[in-house]
Structures are given as C-alpha cells and as structure tokens.
Amino acid sequence: MEKPLVSIVVVSYNHAHFLEENLNSIKAQTYPSIQLIVADDASKDNSIEVYENWLEKNNYPAIKNFHTKNTGLTTTLNECFDLIEGKYVKFIAADDYLHPEAIEKCVNKLEELGNDYGMVFTDTWAINNKSEITKDIADYNANQYLTKEELREKLVLGNRIAALTVLMRTEALKKTGKYPTDIIVEDYYRWLKINEYYWITNIPEKLAYYRLHEHNISKIRLNLLLEEDLILKMKFDKTGIGKQNIDNYFKLNYFKVKQNKKLITQYHQYPFKDKILSFCFNLNFPFLGYRILNKILKTFT
C-alpha cells in the first residue's frame, strides 16, 4: 500500500555549518514517501552552496525557495505553503535534525487516530553546537502523558511543544491560514490555531534533536517575545484557565504595561480580566490607586 506523502520544509538563515547534518537526517528517514522543500532567507554564509552541493551529491530531489533579500521567517514560511504537496507537513530549522524513525512514527500515529487530530509532536533531545546532548532548558518534554483534553486546555498556559518535532496534517495547516507577517512567536500561534479545530496528540519518545546556541537573546527581542506570548494567551483562553497568571503579570508589571498600548488593548478585550484593574488602566490610575479602589470595593462585596 502506498504511503501518504510527507512534505518536509527546511528553513535556513546562516545555518551552513549545520545543514548537512539536517539533510542527512532527512535522507536517513525510514519513511519512504517524502517531498523535500528547502528555503533560505538570504543567508550571509554559504548556506545555498551547501544546499546545492548536498542535493547534487546525494541526487536528492528538492523544491528550492532561495531568497536574495532577507524577508523574515513568516514570509518565507508563507511562500512555502504553496509548495506543499503532502498529506502531512513538517517545518524544521536547518540547525536541528531528526531521529531516523521520526516521520514514520508520527505518520503512523496520525493515520491511526484519524482526521480529528490535526498534529502530533514528540519529545526532543537538546544538543549544543557540537551536537552533544545537553540539558533541556526549555522543558520541552513536559507534556508526555497528558490526555487530549488536558493538552487542549494546558496549551493556553504556555508553549511546551518543540516546533521541530511537530507533524501536521496539511489540511489543518491550510485551514488555520498563513502566518501574520508581523508575528514572531509563529510556532505557538500555529499550535493555538490548530487547537481550536483539532485534537493534538503526542508520542512520548525523543525523536528529534533541538540545537541550543550559545549566544544570548537580546533584551529587546526577549521583551517582544514575552509580550506576544502573553497576547496569544489572552486571545486563545476560552475558559479562564490562564486568568490568575495573566492578572498577576499585569499587577506585578503595572507601571511597565500601562505604557504598552498593545498589551493594554488586548487585556481590555480579555473575557476573564480583572475589571477593576482594567478600569484603572483606562483612567491611567497609579498602582496605589488600584490597590485602594480594589480594597474599598471588596469590602462591599
């Protein structure tokens, strides 16, 4: 029986040093039916040369999406949408790589569970720049034995799904649409969108290798990531499960968030917001004013 086609999209930006390891891991898959799409967002190193040499040397067919001008990750991903031919799809950064059985086990899982399941993810090893296994600082193996209902609910509390481990139904990917071009937490956004329409499942095995780099993320970018993460949690929380954490963040960072219109606007729209806190933000009250007002109102309720 013919196996369903899986599209693997490799995305690179200055990953020349790791590219061969990634591509070799795709070639080594035990699963036979793979469409390879390779994309590069105008790397400053010799990534495209490495791609071309590897593809020629291995006589491996691939669709190429190589940029001469840097456009950003989400634009690159959106372009690759239109190149996907498989029933299933995996996106992977070129500095990560896969266990030989990763695709086969993920396809088998989704085929077994049926169309109600939009994606599957696995556990992952964390590795350093020498491909040595190291400590998993992101705690990506925290969801091992959750039920589908628990996964659906807890995903709103935070992202514990490593993007390189995910295999999606292409139908689920296309139903949830292309990425907003201004988003930087694109993987978490995608899981939350799929979570609205499909069940998500996991395989509690380490079937991928996630590379941790030694350089530090800038403080500005870290703040942007935290801000966007919080906005996504407010947008997708349908039950109030994240209310306590969200309210606490706004209280602890009252002065800072009061100056952030994007965050405040989303908080006003959050169905489970602290109404007194929202009111004080609206009137630009100092935090002491919120505490006094909150205390007064609580004495009458």
Give the ranges of each region predicted by the language model.
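Glycine-rich, basic loop-to-helix element that forms the pyrophosphate-binding segment
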Residues: 66-85, 105
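Short aromatic/hydrophobic "clamp" motif used to bind/position activated sugar donors
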Residues: 89
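A conserved acidic beta->alpha catalytic loop
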Residues: 25, 40-49, 93
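C-terminal subregions of glycosyltransferases and related glycan-biosynthesis enzymes
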Residues: 156, 160, 189, 209-301
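Short, well-formed alpha-helical segments that are part of the catalytic scaffolds
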Residues: 15-28
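Conserved nucleotide-sugar donor-binding catalytic segment
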Residues: 82, 140-229
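Conserved donor NDP-sugar-binding/catalytic core segment of glycosyltransferases
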Residues: 101-135
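Cell-envelope/extracellular polymer assembly enzymes that use nucleotide-activated donors
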Residues: 4-7, 35, 189
